[in-house]
UniProtKB/Swiss-Prot annotation:
GO cellular component: endoplasmic reticulum; extracellular space; Golgi apparatus
Function: Protein disulfide isomerase. Might play a role in the unfolded protein response. May regulate transport of alpha4-beta2 neuronal acetylcholine receptor.
Main location: endoplasmic reticulum
Protein name: Protein disulfide isomerase Creld2
Further information: Secreted under some pathological conditions such as skeletal diseases.
Localization annotation: Endoplasmic reticulum
EC number from the UniProt entry: 5.3.4.1
Highest taxon of source: Eukaryota
Ranges occupied by FU repeats: 191-238, 251-298
Alphabetical UniProt keywords: Calcium, Disulfide bond, EGF-like domain, Endoplasmic reticulum, Glycoprotein, Isomerase, Redox-active center, Repeat, Signal
InterPro entries: EGF-like_Ca-bd_dom, EGF-like_dom, EGF-type_Asp/Asn_hydroxyl_site, EGF_Ca-bd_CS, Furin_repeat, Growth_fac_rcpt_cys_sf, LE_dom, NOTCH1_EGF-like
């Protein structure tokens, strides 16, 4: 029973935590390319080394040159895979003899290790500009796939269908045509350069707003150019009550009025059409009414204190007084002396 529990616990440790996204397993081509990149880096790191025995002339005469030696190959191979990288070590173990054969007898005839090992020997990858199981040429040819204006699906791998995924501004099976919002700056049978239209154009023949064939939404043709439509100048505002309209190129935005406004024409209390209760227009903008300073008392009960707050006021009995229906009545303990004056309530208590 204990063994079963231990096995189950070990299995749980191997499972990814809840919500974790499993990393995509590298393809055989990616694994091969990584191995070759590390091999080439190992060759660069050992390029200036020798046997290190102190008698280089004797060593090279007796053991052959370090440059082509098995000792150098061993040093390179030892640095190819981290001990924890199972897939790399598995690939290296399976293909160790192939790498040794290339090092010993094939390197001069096939100096490009990636092409010899990954493309022709393992058949895991294709050369750039080709794709699929048989390494066919990408659309537009292997030299400039997709006319240089896109990516070939599966380029350099044994996968994909060779179709073009065009860069922004380009379309068509060879990425040679321009999409809406772009115009042809330069074009021949194999090359195409598409450049962006002015922002006012949906389609165009050149870079300015006078070159528009169709105006973009939010723009209108005036004489020979597309110009911005000011939606905020319409007789009826496109915004709801409590908002004002701001025009932007090709569109508009609705912004909230200041909190003191009932309707507004722009930002801030100076642009209110009317003021909310408790505020009045003063020097062109809505300001708080101090009800406590008005000639007519705001607080009606006897002994009651008035405190102004933004947009309103509060009536509070002083310390030492208690509320009744029509007055603030002093309690026996609440007699006020000059040494013990009443204090106004804090802002938090209002």
């Amino acid at each position: 029973m204990h063994l079963l529990l231990a096995a189950a616990f070990g299995l749980l440790l191997l499972l990814p935590p809840p919500g974790a996204v499993a990393s995509r397993k590298p393809t055989m081509c990616q694994r091969c390319r990584t191995l070759v990149d590390k091999f080439n880096q190992g060759m660069a790191n050992t390029a200036r080394k020798n046997f290190g025995g102190g008698n280089t002339a004797w060593e090279e005469k007796t053991l052959s040159k370090y440059e082509f030696s098995e000792i150098r190959l061993l040093e390179i191979m030892e640095g190819l895979c981290d001990s924890s990288d199972f897939e790399c070590n598995q690939l290296l173990e399976q293909q160790e003899e192939q790498l040794e054969a290339w090092w010993q007898t094939l390197k001069k005839e096939h100096p490009n290790l990636f092409e010899w090992f990954c493309v022709h020997t393992l058949k895991a990858c294709c050369l750039p500009g080709t794709y699929g199981p048989d390494c066919q040429e990408c659309q537009g040819g292997s030299e400039r796939p997709c006319s240089g204006n896109g990516y070939c699906s599966g380029d350099g791998s044994r996968q994909g269908d060779g179709s073009c995924q065009c860069h922004t501004g380009y379309k068509g099976p060879l990425c040679i045509d321009c999409t809406d919002g772009f115009f042809s700056l330069q074009r021949n049978e194999t090359h195409s350069i598409c450049s962006a239209c002015d922002e006012s154009c949906k389609t165009c023949s050149g870079p300015s707003n006078k070159d528009c064939i169709q105006c973009e939404v939010g723009w209108a043709r005036v004489e020979d150019a597309c110009v911005d439509v000011d939606e905020c100048a319409a007789e009826t505002s496109p915004c709801s009550d409590g908002q004002y309209c701001e025009n932007v190129n090709g569109s508009y935005t609705c912004e909230d009025c200041d909190s003191t406004c009932v309707g507004c024409t722009g930002k801030g209390p100076a642009n209110c059409k009317e003021c909310i209760a408790g505020y009045t227009k003063e020097s062109g903008q809505c300001t708080d009414i101090d009800e406590c300073s008005l000639e007519e008392k705001a607080c009606k009960r006897k002994n009651e204190n008035c405190y102004n707050v933004p947009g309103s006021f509060v009536c509070v009995c002083p310390e030492g007084f208690e509320e009744t229906e029509d007055a603030c009545v002093q309690t026996a303990e609440g007699k006020v002396t000059e040494e013990n004056p009443t204090q106004p309530p804090s802002r938090e208590d209002l």
